[in-house]
Amino acid sequence: MPGFEVIDEKEKKAISRIFDEGKVFFAHGFDKKRKHYHVREFEQKLKTVFSPQVADTLCVSSGTAAIKVALKALGIGRGDQVITQSFNFIATVEAIVDTGATVIFY
């Protein structure tokens, strides 16, 4: 699997610790039970790495959520049209529809 070669013992220990502490989030993100476990720390580190080009950072639970956040940040909403390719994953279309915009297939 591409990418495995960059995972060393430090990363393996961090991942194991998260599993051992029962703080793994799969499909439903950063709920109150998990208290944003490691997420806010990670966001701050990202902000530091990309500063000053990036004013703020936000972690989301899925690619669909990321598309929704990006569309909202751009002010996309009812009355707008968003062009996307027709051969695509359904989440792209769902995110556009969720904003109230109209999907235009390219």
Q: Where are the regions that the model predicts?
A:
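Conserved PLP-binding active-site segment in aminotransferase class I/II-type PLP enzymes
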Residues: 1-72, 77
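PLP-dependent aminotransferase-like
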Residues: 72-106
